[in-house]
Amino acid sequence: MQAPKFDKFKKYFNRKKASIDEVVRELTAGGIVFRRNKAGEIEILLIKDPKGRWSIPKGHVEEGETAQETALREIAEEAGLKETEAICWLGKTHFRYRRLTTLVLMTTQIYLVKALNPEERAQKEEFYEEIKWFAFNDALEAVEYEDISKLMLLAMKRIRHAGH
């Protein structure tokens, strides 16, 4: 009796991913946007992306723009909030992903941003599924990325310390 031939399986399992031909760095910036509701409680703005993940408004830094300017521009574009103020820099996150044969190394600068007009209505960009103001603890629970969660805790500490 002959052993079964596993040539088809060998071909399948021996396939390798295409090699990385290029490594690119992308700089992005965003903001943890907060406001006080009518009861005086802190609320955090989150946006749900097309994959159903809650996160903060953020995007690519354009030429000639500072990271802080990018954060405020992205908040205006993605959330429709024009009356905002960057309070302070909170930190940065690092993320990497593969785009075919390119390895993308993304660094995102995150700012604490205050919505100056609590009556200004947040309006999502067409690209996003949903936009919503969350109570702080609910936002912390909803956000998908651990590094953003950690910066949200720092944001709350800064908000309380500064009396915003």
Question: What label would you give each PLM region?
Answer:
Residues 1-37:
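Acidic, metal-coordinating catalytic segment for phosphate/diphosphate chemistry
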Residues 4, 12, 141-164:
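Charged phosphate-binding loop/patch that engages nucleotide di/tri-phosphates or the phosphate backbone
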Residues 37-43, 100-103:
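Short, solvent-exposed loop/turn segments that connect beta-strands within catalytic domains
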Residues 45-48:
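Short, acidic/hydrophobic/Gly-rich beta-strand patch recurrent on exposed beta strands
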Residues 50-53:
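Short connector loops/turns at beta-strand edges and beta->alpha or beta->beta junctions
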Residues 55-58:
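A short gly/proline-enriched turn/hairpin at secondary-structure junctions
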Residues 61-150:
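Unchanged
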